Amino acid sequence: MTDIKPMQLGEILDGALTIYRRNVGLFSMLGIIALAGPLIFFAFLSGPLTRSFLPLAEQLRVGRQPSLDQWQPMLPFLGLVLLGMILYYIASYFLAAGAMRIISDTYLGRRPQLGDAISLGASKMLPLVGVALCKVALLTLLWIGCVIGIVVLATIMGLIGKGVASLAAFAGFVGAFWFAAFVMCGYGVTTQVLTLEEGVGVFGAFARSWELTRQRKLKVFWTALVSGIVFYFIPYVVVLGVAAALQGISPPLGRVVGALSQFLPIVCAPLIVSALTLLYYDLRVRREGFDLQILSQRLGVG
């Protein structure tokens, strides 16, 4: 068994890569099961969406503002994009729960099974959807509150002068970003809490996450940011760069590589989940002496 111990950011990222490498087949299968539907939906939608937007893009390019009637053909596609985003968002929570089972079994020295991962993900879907909806509502309220606050601040400072108003607006944006990041980092491990702790409901998961991240929100922020850059942004840049380079050499091959880039979340998403799950273990170890016996009991492993 691998000991659960306090970890620094580098150890969390290294541990996530190690666990992923050991179970790459399982993570890939789980990613395909969870995300293939939404990603295929987006792949089929991208062609018609692009073709419908091209006339509008041409008008915008030459400096003309399209009329409302010209935008109307885009509305059905925008509705489908919203539907796809909702499906992807919910599917990502199923993937997260299943991936946590694989990660936890790896820590316990057991051989992870795809069936166990799917079973845990399916059993947690209803409360995880609740968490997902609560996070969307929270982000929406934060966005509305921050916008209102910035507008009011800029308006008041505008009575002094335009320069002061601009400075106040900039300070407001910085403050709003900090506040939103602070709140979301506080609720950064709600999915892990709901999946890996017994008897915790949706709202209890938010309270529990806030308690675990107390005085550790900066670590949550850096873990999420760095893992997002390393496991998402850099792979996308590399793949899209290769696709662009191949376009000049072999356009069909370039298009194939570009199309495959849409399926990168199948590979990348489990890495993000692994990093955040190891962060959750780290937070519990530091606060509660979390160990393998507790994890084993939670998963029902003898």
Stretches with model-predicted labels:
Residues I33, L83, C134, L138, ...:
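Hydrophobic residues within alpha-helical transmembrane segments
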Residues R284-G302:
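Short, highly charged, low-complexity non-transmembrane loops/tails of multi-pass membrane proteins
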Residues M1-K5, I40, F44, P73-R110, ...:
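Selective recognition of hydrophobic, aromatic-rich stretches within alpha-helical transmembrane segments
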Residues F53-Q72:
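Perimembrane loop-to-helix junctions flanking transmembrane segments
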Residues A36-L39, I90, F94, A132-T140, ...:
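Hydrophobic alpha-helical transmembrane bundles that constitute the permease/transmembrane domains
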Residues M1-L54, R111-G115, A176-R255:
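Nonpolar helix-loop interface/hinge motif
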Residues P76-F77, V81, G115-W143, A169-F177:
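Alpha-helical membrane-spanning segments of integral membrane proteins, especially the hydrophobic core
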Residues T18-R21, P66-L75, I118-S123, G161-G163, ...:
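Helix-boundary and loop/linker segments of multi-pass membrane transporters
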